[in-house]
Amino acid sequence: MTKRIEERIEGVIESLGYLLYDVSLIKESEQHILRVSLKNPNGAVSLDNCQQVSEIISPLLDVCDFLKDAYILEVSSMGLERTLKTPKHFKLSLGEKVAVKLMNKQSFQAILKDANDLSVDFELENHTIKSVEYKDLKKVKTLFEW
């Protein structure tokens, strides 16, 4: 279901100058919450940006009737520290510092250099590139440094 929602709102969000990072549907205390995460290619995502996107996509979602139950729409930035799960997440996070845990229990910190649909390239501290297939990744999380 979130894939259909993503397909419907992505073009609208891009027309406003933002990138759609993620869509998730969760249930908290019997309430359905549709979370839409944005990236602003020109800087930070502000509260005004979130409000603008919310006001545009809310009626669109109501008309499409993807969700049968009542829900709360939450629009936010993708966040400074987040877990990368899909090739799209990796592509939208190029150049960021990440903590990587592999399936073989190896872990390291690196800069995310490149990503495609099969693998991702990390620049290690010694400036070498380590290429890893998605299937070999256990967890990758962006790191924010103050």
UniProtKB/Swiss-Prot annotation:
Keywords: Cytoplasm, Ribosome biogenesis. It is found in: Cytoplasm. GO terms for cellular component: cytosol. InterPro entries: Ribosome_maturation_RimP, RimP_C, RimP_C_sf, RimP_N, RimP_N_sf. It holds the Pfam family RimP_N. SUPFAM superfamilies: YhbC-like, C-terminal domain, YhbC-like, N-terminal domain. One of its GO terms (biological process) is translation. Required for maturation of 30S ribosomal subunits. Belongs to the RimP family. This is Ribosome maturation factor RimP. The lineage of its organism: Bacteria, Pseudomonadati, Campylobacterota, Epsilonproteobacteria, Campylobacterales.
